[in-house]
Amino acid sequence: MGKGKKGGKRMNKAQLTEILQQFFAERPGETLSFKEIFRSLHLTTHPLKMLAIDIMEEMAWDDYLAKVSDNSYRLNQSVQVMEGKFVRKANGKNSVIPDGEENPIFVSERNSMGALNGDRVEFTFLARRKNHIKEAQVNKILERAKDTFVGRLKVDKDLAYLVTPGDVFAHNIIIPRRKVKGGKTDDKAVVRIIEWPDGENKSPIGEVVDILGQKGDNDVEMNSILAQYGLPYKYPKNVEDAANKISGEITEQDYKEREDFRKVFTCTIDPKDAKDFDDALSIQRLENGNWQVGVHIADVSHYVTEGSIIDKEAVKRATSVYLVDRTIPMLPERLCNFICSLRPNEEKLAYSVIFELNNNAEVKNYRIVHTVIESDRRYKYEEVQELLEANGVIDGTGEPAPAETKEHPYQGENALQLITLDRLAKKLRAARFKNGAVKFDREELHFDIDEKGKPISCYYKRSKDANKLVEEFMLLANRTVAESIGKVKKGKKPKTLPYRIHDNPDPQKLETLREFVVKFGYKMKTEGTKGATARSLNKLMADCEGKPENNLIQMVALRAMMKAKYSVHNIGHFGLAFEYYTHFTSPIRRYPDTMVHRLLTKYAQGGRSANEKHYEELCEHCSDMEQIAQNAERDSIKYKMVEFMGDKLGEEFDAHISGITSYGIYATIDENHCEGMIPMRDIADDYYDFDEKNFCLIGRRHHNKYQLGDAIRIKVAQANLEKKQLDFALAGDSAPIRKEKPEASTSSEKTKKSKQKTRNHRRNK
């Protein structure tokens, strides 16, 4: 590399390239002569000037600069200044996601301007280097994602520090001793930034705003996760006070204005630990032989007035948050668990969709009305499942219970009603999949927790027929409500409504999925109509059901899907194959449902269409908060996973490879489904190359292969609660154990032990 001097310091080509890129990026549209460039950058020596000219030639070749004349350049007009969201990673692989796009652009630490995860930034693309990787440079931080951060305090005599995860700051936060607020070393604390870093090596300055408690305490750790994502871990007293003043009494006027369903069989079906009962189902036989099924939803909007102090807090939260061991409700407890909750043997106000269904579950009629209900029974999913199976239902087959006869009457309290609901739900489900809905039945990780919050067991929970019974009627109600507003005559504009939309899958991601499943011997079509894509996905899900790779394939398939979100601009829902879909059925825990309730009432009374721009902004906020809540939930799962494995260091388990990266192998233990990483630096028998296209690592000398889905034996090496990370090491026969894999997935050789050094990759997922 050429060397030169600037201000008495030697400078190489890479350093001068960065300086020139920054120089031109700050002067878009200006034509700059060599003379101006040399003078502005203090390039005084002949070698340095010649090096600068060579670099500018290369930048022009890369289309970063446009050559105006033999001795002048300007920033290429196509190199526009863009805006996007910055993503910071602990392994230094930072990136920026341009507005309106999904693919991240790499940003090196030196070009990040100290941007934090989630910051909105202005950036430009850099000239491509020899590796041809697209790279960006942050020019300005437009908006900080947040100004408060959570971490562990380290208190010294004169200064204190907040130690944060590597994906937050490149440096720890310095806290003046007088601003520690009584915090001690190893306390978890919330710190507000009072002075942002303005240089590459400068740490931010902060002040403690809340001490959460000592690290390791369960409540402290869960509250730390909430605080990390800016989620509330306390309920404001003034909001609680306002909720306590709300009367749960049903007035004579309420009875007059509502349909009375108190004498119709009604029940709730929920998880065993649920307290907020959003929805209830009623059923009765009509004189014409059809069935009247009521989907009754807690009438939150009756009690929470738009613009009230409770409503403002609900808007801010937008959703309830579900951590492993607790729920952080969107509404105050008095509302969500008592007044609004559809508790058994209590009269409750509801917003209901009443369906008339024939025996094939075809909707013959419906109405959307305010009601008064009284639930006869609070069922747990397990109780309904037990009743169904006791009457001949085989879970997962899609077949209802056999018809009741005098010789074989249905067994169990309210058996006829529940079995009829199940039969109708199964017909609705079959029709939905026939129409092109995508079938994802992924198992969810659950923990059994003791009274101190410590996990004592870890297992996957699968959705059974009882869950699907409730799900189908909720889907039907949500779709019907959306159609009632959105489905209008051609040429007429529908009134504003928040829809739940799900765009078609990204074709490139579908192709990646196709290439992946081929390695397991499966075929998949990625071209054709939406319906053809859905049918191909469903066939794939059916083919891999019950196989060791099932969860893995479902995970990769889900990554090929777009994220569902809220919007007033309806594009339909790909996954459900619904042209119109909204969220109406969970107003206790989702704010969009409350918005829909209010708009339905307004439009039923002849009101004009609501402000589209205002509701789109609310939709965007709710979508963002939903994602944040999901991230917090995942972090709580990771924490409990590490805590659960903490006393199993050195133990060996059978596992499957669930992720392959350039810095290591992710593996999921078969027995308890906990996931950890085997760092690349610890696979010391060879130098491994990451084959991203084929989802595998291949050794250069011995050609051993580690591939997604492979069976391996691991040993628990480390459980880091602070980072929420498990480290594994290969154990026993450390090469993948291949069992009856197709030819496309070749067998590995046994791993040969050696001391050859390998890359030292920092970890992140």
Task: State each model region's role.
Residues 1-14, 687-696, 731-765:
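Acidic, low-complexity intrinsically disordered tails
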Residues 2-294, 301-347, 378, 385-386, ...:
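Charge-lined substrate channels and their catalytic hotspots, especially those that engage the 3′ end
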Residues 39, 190, 195-197, 214, ...:
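Electropositive polyanion-binding surfaces
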Residues 64, 120, 188, 362, ...:
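Residue-level marker of beta-strand positions
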Residues 103-108, 169-175, 673-690, 738-740:
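A short macromolecule-binding patch
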Residues 119, 679-722, 726, 738-754:
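Intrinsically disordered, low-complexity linker and terminal regions at domain boundaries
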Residues 126, 194, 658, 717-719:
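Short, surface-exposed secondary-structure boundary micro-motifs
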Residues 151, 201, 717-731:
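Internal insertion modules embedded within essential enzymes
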